[in-house]
Amino acid sequence: AGTMTGFVSNPIEYAEASKVAIFGVGMYTWNIENYDPTQAWKDACDFIMPEASMAFRIFCEHNCDPGPNGHQYRREESANYVAPIQTFLAGYKKNTFPEQSANLLGTLFAQITASPSMIYSQSPNKRLIEQINPWLIQFEFLGKAGTSALHMAHAWYEKDRSYTWQRYLETSALLDSMKLINRTLNQKAQPKGVKVGSKVLHPFIVDLYRQTGRNLLSTDGIAPDEVKVSIPSIFTNIDQLKSQPCAEGDNTVGYVPLFEVVKVQPNQYLGIGWEIQKEAESFCFNLPKSNQPGRVFEWSADGKSWSLIPHVSTENAKDTIRTIDPKARYIRMRNNSDQQMELYVLGFTATTKQDPQINEALMMYDMNLDTYKNLNPGEMIHIKCDDINAVSFFLSGSNENLVSITGLSQDGEKNIVYQGNVGYIKLNKTMFEDFSSLEITTIGKESIHIHQIVRE
């Protein structure tokens, strides 16, 4: 150590982007006893991008974590906002709107939205901008999604379901854009994709979005926490896997690989589930050391009653199963022995059919606001009015399109119950009590989307 005068680094293709980390190492080796990591980080940001140092600091502060990975290696990120987020989510789930936390987060998301354009316009370091460009693009979407999600939550707090639904659709579109960027940019590197705010901020937006979806689908008889949303998911009663993230694609759902031994006690399991309107095409597993007696694979239509998947040899640690019951919506591997199993989870994925024959009734009643049934011009959907006190429609489409809801009586008489813009529409019983069914159709040249029909 007494002869050390410097250090060597090899940032490979990200030389400029690596300078923040290299600067910190340099400050540490220069004066180990008085090293201040926070100050070194601030100095690095100021030195590398003096023209837009605050914007660059904001970008770096919320881009530390590599995202979910098989090594379970995560970095601290957005540390100053963990407590406000926890406070806000806890309050929101109790139908309150913690304003202090909301204002703090609203300011942050506004800064995040503005930071990329400031970096683009003010920094002359074109090589650095080129290296971080995919993350700058994604970062702006993160800020917009966070802002939209907070507006969505406030609308729900104000008991404005119509505006909540508008903001829900906006937040959904922004999150979809982030998914698209993650799947299309930076695909040649390892790890692939573009993840920003992956430790704290992005999970917060998704949590807020999903909680609001449950709120919207709730009724007087079904509380938000009782709403069972049909989305791709993983489930397990193995402690080691409970925090393992879900790897979700357009037509796939599975576990992010875990490169450590997983201990599976008797009757413990790991499983996956997918949307109610989709049918599985295949199931692949890669579970080294699992090929031993007592390992069973099972499927279920409802997540409660399970049936054995036949003809899966216990001699194979990995395999692809293509004969899956069309009713299956869940698959799990369970330790059916009286001994502990030790295995690796390198692959556990279901692939759904890309062009399934979708039952439109499932699309409109699947308890998933992200899916929808296309209602084309001239097409009609009928809803029976028996034994319901209210019916809600979650619709989306062009602002130029109108929707018409007509009541049909037993003797064939028709009367318009609603005619107007698409969006959230709720009809109380007094509006249709004289009718046996309702008929919904679009007025215009374009189709509309029926995301959900909720009968109360």
Whereabouts are the PLM-identified features?
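Short beta-strand-plus-loop segments that form exposed binding edges in beta-rich domains
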Residues: 333-339, 439-446
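Substrate-binding groove of N-acetylhexosamine-processing glycoside hydrolases
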Residues: 1-232, 428-429, 433-439
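Flexible loop residues that form catalytic
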Residues: 12, 288, 336, 396, ...
